[in-house]
Amino acid sequence: MSFSQKYFQENEFAIRDKKLKYYLSPTLLENNFKHGFFTKTSSEINLLLLSNRLKLNNKNCVLNQIHSNQIVFGSKTEEKQREEADGIVCDKQNQNLWIYTADCMPILFADKRKRLVAAIHCGRKGLENKIIKKLIKIFVIKDAQKKICLSQ
């Protein structure tokens, strides 16, 4: 059992909705960010159906994750034409960021004041190539505060 699964179980942040099971971060909830960390079973559900079920718009920002240190802005991504990268930064309101992980770490950054959110798929190669440092630099340029919300 991963640290985040154990943490969420102990703090009762697991949500179950028939086939859909996901976890919520207390930090993101306190700051009114819509979010969810989904299980493998949930990933089998079509992204548009998942967005509708969670009452999200259909502005899904999805990546073709390549185990790199590449970071893109959400407006460059579309579900049908995925950018090759492992990090994504919201640059418009109401964008849905989607990151998939197995043995890599999902890491979220958020700034309540700027309403800026970023997600990275952090594996060994991305970590070695300083993807986290690269994302922090983007937050500094955007005058955002850096706060890691969750890492597995």
Regions found by a protein language model. Give the residues of each.
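Active-site microenvironment for binding and transforming phosphate-containing groups
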Residues: M1-Q152
